[in-house]
A protein has these predicted regions:
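Short loop-to-alpha-helix "cap/lid" segments that border enzyme active sites
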Residues: 102-115
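A short, conserved beta-to-alpha structural element at the edge of catalytic cores
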Residues: 38-46, 148-163
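Glycine-rich phosphate-binding loop signature in dinucleotide/nucleotide-binding domains
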Residues: 5, 61, 114-120
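Acidic, Mg2+-coordinating phosphoryl-transfer loop and its flanking beta/alpha structural elements
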Residues: 111, 118-158
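Alpha-helical substrate-recognition element adjacent to the catalytic core
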Residues: 2-101
Length: 163
């Protein structure tokens, strides 16, 4: 049962939704993948204008929640990046450092937990599998299609549970 006295939440992914990760894809193209370097380069991600505009617009009516597959060890860099780009404050849900489940499982679990007490107005994410599962579970989804899709990132999201 959601608490109608609190505003609804709008849930935003980070990588390739708000943050352009194209400059760090090269770390996923080698074998083995260089995850530490991939995440270490995240503070240098340029923001996507489309995503930033949507977060700001959503913040007029909703509480913002950030839902990322980034590991918890990246929290400080992530919070600094959000602040540096003037994004609205909001709770940041991150993957446990040792959690290797697919993004669609971890994110849907958190969405369902949020929905127990709040109206989830929208999920904005670039991962098609996350979006498909969220829609099947009854959530309203906006697919962030403004990033160039990376086959390496897609494989990492699904098979390696790393972003």
């Amino acid at each position: 049962v959601s608490d109608s006295s609190r505003p609804p939440v709008a849930v935003f992914d980070l990588d390739n939704t708000l943050a352009d990760t194209a400059h760090r894809q090269r770390f996923l193209e080698r074998r083995p993948r260089h995850w530490d370097a991939f995440f270490a380069a995240a503070p240098h991600d340029p923001p996507f204008v489309e995503g930033v505009a949507l977060v700001r617009e959503s913040a007029e009516e909703c509480e913002i929640v950030y839902l990322t597959g980034r590991p918890e060890r990246c929290r400080r860099d992530t919070l600094d990046w959000l602040a540096a780009h003037g994004l609205p404050e909001g709770a940041v849900h991150m993957r446990g450092n040792a959690d290797r489940r697919p993004a669609r499982r971890t994110k849907l679990e958190i969405l369902r937990r949020l929905a127990r007490t709040r109206e989830v107005r929208v999920l904005v994410d670039d991962d098609e599998l996350v979006c498909d599962d969220a829609e099947r579970a009854g959530f309203t989804v906006l697919r962030a299609r403004w990033a160039a899709r990376s086959a390496e990132l897609r494989a990492a999201q699904e098979r390696e549970g790393r972003t």
